[in-house]
From Swiss-Prot:
Transmembrane segments: 5-25, 37-57, 75-95
Modification(s) after translation: The N-terminus is blocked.
Organism encoding this protein: Sulfurisphaera tokodaii (strain DSM 16993 / JCM 10545 / NBRC 100140 / 7) (Sulfolobus tokodaii)
Membrane topology: Multi-pass membrane protein
Protein name: A-type ATP synthase subunit K
Amino acid sequence: MKKTWLPFLLLPLLVSATIFSAQAPYDTAQGFEGLNIGAGLAIGLAAIGAGVAVGMAAAAGIGVLTERRDMFGTILIFVAIGEGIAVYGILFAVLMLFGKF
């Protein structure tokens, strides 16, 4: 995807966030409006990063496994480390949403 599409993809998010924050019928705490977007970005970007990391580690791991079968445990650990990025994203989102600031 070309980088010229990025502003067109982010524009609806920013417009809808502005509209929804303007239509809030209740009082929100100072600075709370951005937490929902921040939590969503934390999960989404962490999932993208984990997908890239797991994809690269798994592709390299399959190449290693064709030559050395005894490296399976090591490769599995490297793939699991890449998946930990998504777990950290979920953890940060939960802390943002339910943490006391």
